[in-house]
């Protein structure tokens, strides 16, 4: 959107604070229904960030897929679960939780140091042909496809790995 500078900056700060507060709500709230609503707030804020950066197609896809489908599915799953099982065990930290948090923290630190120390400009993931001129493309969806397969190949693959890990975690939780 073409907004004046102060309004654009205010919206960025407002959406950023909504994103941070919503993500803290997802992690820190003990009631899973409230956590799911906080996740919906986070996803809506991300969609509004896309609107501010003139990516209307991605914003609509974000709203339809994540907020409209996945977050509602999470809410239904949480509401159909027995709520009393969340409050039976008051022991917050076990040995397994401590080991898991230590392993996850070490993986996070190693990933952050690797990402920050890598010179990403020297890595050529795919060859971009010179015949593709972005101004001649018909719509935003073609530009998104080209950027996902060339410029944003690494983040796209990292997101697919994160989704795969989340799917495996959901299966493990469902088996318990």
Swiss-Prot record:
Name the EC number(s). Answer: 7.1.1.-
Task: List, in alphabetical order, the Gene Ontology terms for molecular function in this entry.
Answer: NADH dehydrogenase (ubiquinone) activity; quinone binding
Extract the signal peptide range.
none
> How is this protein positioned relative to the membrane?
Multi-pass membrane protein
What does the UniProt entry say about where the protein is found? Plastid, Chloroplast thylakoid membrane
Q: Which domain of life is it from?
A: Eukaryota
Q: Is Transmembrane helix tagged as a keyword?
A: yes
Q: Looking at the keywords, is Chloroplast present? A: yes
Pfam families linked to this entry: Oxidored_q3
Q: Which family does it belong to?
A: Belongs to the complex I subunit 6 family.
What is the annotated quaternary arrangement, including any partners? NDH is composed of at least 16 different subunits, 5 of which are encoded in the nucleus.
Name it.
NAD(P)H-quinone oxidoreductase subunit 6, chloroplastic
Gene source species: Eucalyptus globulus subsp. globulus
Taxonomic lineage: Eukaryota, Viridiplantae, Streptophyta, Embryophyta, Tracheophyta
Gene (UniProt): ndhG
